[in-house]
């Protein structure tokens, strides 16, 4: 109700100025401004993410060591295995590294936890690797807390490259580690999904085979009335400074190294002659590189920048130097310098989009860039063949991935049949792909019934759901461990507090639990101090898993209860992006709002508030008639999922209503109809 509504209060003058400078709709500018995106550059980065904005994979700690170790294994013919988590983040990660190794002529043995095997790497799996003669294991979306198991593997002569994104413990495994969450990580974005980390490793490996690997490029430009230079190595910009005119000769003679490759951006003949006199291995003009890699015929630097900026989605805003544009064009060209490498990255990035959304990672920063690009690739008819088979001709969006594709493909792992999902992603037989989609779809229908039935059972058997305890837990041997997290998440959303759901003992007599928080409450921070009570514990602040001996269940739950305390703080505020006159709603407005996609965690669909609404009619619909629909004005539907009763009560009063809602277009018979999706209702003042 209104007590929990919070409408964003923006500076109207600044919003108008931002909209005018960026050439965007004022409503979109207002939403962005309210979410802290308030400069032309940040608006451009958000609405038009560029491939060159992705951080270099070599900024990740351990990346050079990982590349060197894998290349040594490939050169010497070592047997390599990939070990992944069994969810979609893990399986998409496995798919990328498996395909990479296949293309590098070294097919890998793949392994992941199977039904009732428990959580993560085990000694039994290590023994399996040893017996197969494997000497290098690459973990994807897991491994950062498998300290004892990796230590055991090292004693068996097996090395590990751990690519993971889960929270590390204070002790780390004896392996090459690639994880943006490491305490000493210098990587600019810590919220990559597991598949994002795997993608970075694949990119680094592909880069290492290019002639540009470990070469320092020096971009020198004459722009804005002066000279500028930038050092770039492996996509990392290390120095970006101006030069006084008088110091250009000194710079060329004293700072340039004999191994440097120089790229000139709009420089005159005098600078070219100075640089050429050094006898460097490479000196080229930026526009000539563009002609080579983009198959263009530019005759000058200015013509090159003018032609490539829109192609690369680069925009010049106040405060952006011409030199900075030249550097960004160079980074784009370097990424595209190999058709084979760029083609593989385009092939892999839809997998990153699906895995990142499926793991509910923040849709901001680099994640947003990769998701945007991955969805664009799928909508162009390219990318993973199985994903294209699922989507067909329908437009792919973050919503279709999170509501349809990810739940479907997560089903086999949740039901203890991970092999089906792995085969779906790895097979190259399109007929087999179609068979698998049919099997997985049937399994998904079964999964929905089981989850609904289990939730009803828990509600019936549990009295503690409505108590003021800081969290709720439930254990049942019949619950499939793969469904525990999904059930916990649904119940947490319902009762608005953290939930733990535990399944029966695995092959080693361990209880396996999945914990889900509510809102932004850091549940893991209250459980992590109790780590000695668990066989395994790991994950994220709001979603984590664990195992412990079955006989310890009461002791463990009591300890968590003491740590969490009573009634942990929660935020029920509904944050509204903008007030909107409902008469302004049409399908064109909703289409313009799609610029804000992809949506997800930390970039939720915008919420609007319309006041003093007169409801024309009310109708129930759905199998159980538990959904409601208002007709507002002449043609706008306002639907409320599972809100039939409350909508009836409000409409039958005859009073005007204030409604908080999302907007969507409903397609019917090839026409778009605007629709409000109700979040909350109250009487108008």
Predicted regions and their residues:
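Conserved DEDDh/DEDDy metal-dependent 3′-5′ exonuclease domain
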Residues: 239-296, 319-330
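Short alpha-helix plus adjacent loop in nuclease-associated cores
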Residues: 176-182, 280-308
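OB-fold single-stranded nucleic acid-binding module
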Residues: 552-558, 646, 653-685
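Hydrophobic helix-and-loop "lid/oligomerization" segment in the mid-to-C-terminal part
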Residues: 2, 12, 18-136, 156, ...
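Single-stranded nucleic-acid-binding OB-fold domains
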Residues: 225, 618-624, 641-643, 664-674
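Accessory interdomain/linker segments of ATP-dependent helicases and helicase-like nucleic-acid enzymes
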Residues: 578-640
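Acidic, Mg2+-coordinating catalytic module of metal-dependent nucleases/exonucleases
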Residues: 194-198, 204, 275, 303-345, ...
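Beta-strand/loop nucleic-acid-binding surfaces
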Residues: 635-651
């Amino acid at each position: 109700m209104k007590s929990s509504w919070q409408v964003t209060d923006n500076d109207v003058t600044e919003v108008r100025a931002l909209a005018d400078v960026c050439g965007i709709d004022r409503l979109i500018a207002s939403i962005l401004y309210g979410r802290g995106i308030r400069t032309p550059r940040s608006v451009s980065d958000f609405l038009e993410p560029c491939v060159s904005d992705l951080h270099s994979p070599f900024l990740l700690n351990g990346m050079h060591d990982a590349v060197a170790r894998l290349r040594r294994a490939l050169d010497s013919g070592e047997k390599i295995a990939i070990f992944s988590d069994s969810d979609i983040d893990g399986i998409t990660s496995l798919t990328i590294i498996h395909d990479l190794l296949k293309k590098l002529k070294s097919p890998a043995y793949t392994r992941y936890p199977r039904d009732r095997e428990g959580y993560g790497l085990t000694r039994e799996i290590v023994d399996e690797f040893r017996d197969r003669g494997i000497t290098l294991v690459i973990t994807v979306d897991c491994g950062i807390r498998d300290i004892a198991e990796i230590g055991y593997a090292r004693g068996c002569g097996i090395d590990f490259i751990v690519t993971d994104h889960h929270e590390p413990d204070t002790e780390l495994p004896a392996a090459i580690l690639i994880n943006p969450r490491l305490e000493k990580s210098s990587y600019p974005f810590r919220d990559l999904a597991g598949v994002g980390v795997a993608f970075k490793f694949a990119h680094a490996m592909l880069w290492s085979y290019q002639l540009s690997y470990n070469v320092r490029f020096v971009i020198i430009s004459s722009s804005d009335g002066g000279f500028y230079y930038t050092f770039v190595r492996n996509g990392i910009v290390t120095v970006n400074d101006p030069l006084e005119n008088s110091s250009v000769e000194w710079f060329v003679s004293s700072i340039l190294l004999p191994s440097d490759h120089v790229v000139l951006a709009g420089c005159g003949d005098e600078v070219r002659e100075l640089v050429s006199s050094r006898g460097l291995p490479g000196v080229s003009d930026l526009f000539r590189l563009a002609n080579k890699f983009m198959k263009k015929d530019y005759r000058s630097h200015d013509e090159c920048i003018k032609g490539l900026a829109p192609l690369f989605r680069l925009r010049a805003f106040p405060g952006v130097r011409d030199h900075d544009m030249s550097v960004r064009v160079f980074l784009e060209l370097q990424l595209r310098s190999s058709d084979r490498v760029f083609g593989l990255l385009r092939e892999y990035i839809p997998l990153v989009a699906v895995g990142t959304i499926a793991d509910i990672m923040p849709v901001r920063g680099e994640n947003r860039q990769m998701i945007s690009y991955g969805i664009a690739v799928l909508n162009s008819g390219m990318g993973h063949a199985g994903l294209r088979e699922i989507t067909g001709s329908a437009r792919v969006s973050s919503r279709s991935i999170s509501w349809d594709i990810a739940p479907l493909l997560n089903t086999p792992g949740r039901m203890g049949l991970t092999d089906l999902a792995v085969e779906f992603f790895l097979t190259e037989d399109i007929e087999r792909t179609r068979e698998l989609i049919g099997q997985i779809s049937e399994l998904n229908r079964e999964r929905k019934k089981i989850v609904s039935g289990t939730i009803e059972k828990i509600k019936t058997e549990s009295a503690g759901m409505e108590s003021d305890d800081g969290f709720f837990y439930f254990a049942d041997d019949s619950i499939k461990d793969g469904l525990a997290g999904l059930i916990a998440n649904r119940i947490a959303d319902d009762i608005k507090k953290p939930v733990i759901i535990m399944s029966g003992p695995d092959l080693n007599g361990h209880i396996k639990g999945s914990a889900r928080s509510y809102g932004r409450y850091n549940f893991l921070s209250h459980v992590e101090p109790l780590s000695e009570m668990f066989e395994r514990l790991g994950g994220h602040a709001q979603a984590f898993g664990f195992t412990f001996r079955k006989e310890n269940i009461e002791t463990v739950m009591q300890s968590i209860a003491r740590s969490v305390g009573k009634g942990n703080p929660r935020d029920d505020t509904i944050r509204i992006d903008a007030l909107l006159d409902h008469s302004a709603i049409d399908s064109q407005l909703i289409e313009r709002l799609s610029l804000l996609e992809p949506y997800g965690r930390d970039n939720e669909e915008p919420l609007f508030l319309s006041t003093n609404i007169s409801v024309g009619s009310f109708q129930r619909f759905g199998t159980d008639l538990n959904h409601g629909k208002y007709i507002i004005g002449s043609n706008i539907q306002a639907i409320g999922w599972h809100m039939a009763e409350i909508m009836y009560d409000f409409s039958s009063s005859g009073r005007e209503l204030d409604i908080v809602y999302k907007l969507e277009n409903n397609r019917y018979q090839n026409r778009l109809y605007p629709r409000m999706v109700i979040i909350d209702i109250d009487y108008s003042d």
